[in-house]
């Protein structure tokens, strides 16, 4: 059994990405894995990084990652890139 941290970045609960998230989580749980999921849009995550010290949200996500075995990112690709909210999350949470 693994603990999986899922980071989801799509604004619509009716999107193809929402279906991917739901199916992934249901299947992983059926296989005995533990899921911890954040929805960046519902959480209103601030993706702008200006070199400041991590805020409480960033520190919380980092702690949750430390307790996980795997990270899964679920987001659309728009113009060959992930949405800014996901890219900002990567910069703020995973950056040194």
Where are these regions (language model features)?
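N-terminal beta1-alpha1-beta2 submodule of the flavodoxin-like/Rossmannoid cofactor-binding fold
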Residues: 1-96
């Amino acid at each position: 059994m693994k603990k999986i941290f899922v980071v989801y970045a799509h604004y619509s609960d009716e999107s193809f990405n929402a279906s991917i998230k739901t199916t992934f989580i249901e299947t992983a749980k059926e296989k005995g894995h533990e899921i911890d999921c954040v929805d960046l849009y519902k959480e209103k995550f601030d993706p702008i990084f200006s070199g400041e010290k991590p805020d409480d949200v960033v520190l919380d996500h980092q702690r949750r990652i430390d307790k996980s075995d795997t990270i899964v990112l679920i987001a659309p690709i728009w113009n060959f890139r992930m949405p800014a909210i996901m890219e900002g999350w990567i910069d703020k949470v995973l950056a040194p």
